[in-house]
Amino acid sequence: MFSDRVLRPGDPVYYDILHSYMGYRTCYYRCFTIGYASHAMNDAYKRCREYLDAAIELVRPGRTTAEIAAVWPKAEEFGFPNEEACFALQYGHGIGLAIWEKPVISRLVSFDHPCEIKPGMVFALETFWPSTDGWSAARIEEEIVVTETGHEVITRFPAEELLVAGRHYFTVDGPLPAIRENEAAPSQRIREMIEASSRQERVGVSE
């Protein structure tokens, strides 16, 4: 749904990050909140992460897509009438020259059509969980390569915890600079105009 609604503090946002390099695709969701995260949103993210980690832990040669799908909740457990209604929310799919390839990992199809996991397979696993506030939700996705003895997660964008836009984060080299400390003057001016607009204040573009 498209709208002219300005993002507000506390809003959840998730992106499906799609790159292409030498013809090969990526597909991984990352979830953020604007300014701060509510308890409901944090709880939803933790639940979402737990289901994702449980699925990743099972990835190794000899396992099947049905075994992975079995660790995910039934549709009725998170507000949907059946598996078809929530298809692709708790989901896995191969990825390569196309974004969606085999194998497919889903409670809708994997139990009836299981596929053996083999070394060299590359696929994405994604999970979703609604928050108790009734309108927000969390979504996370990781890309995995199947090795001879297990798996390797190849996505590098942090997703262990819910990220909050505008908060300071730290690395081994020290704090990451906040966006507003880095932005150029034109970007800063645009941001100030958007913020003023959300407060219904009038700002002249020539100032």
How does the language model describe each region?
Residues 1-207:
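Active-site neighborhoods and metal-handling regions in enzymes and metal-associated proteins
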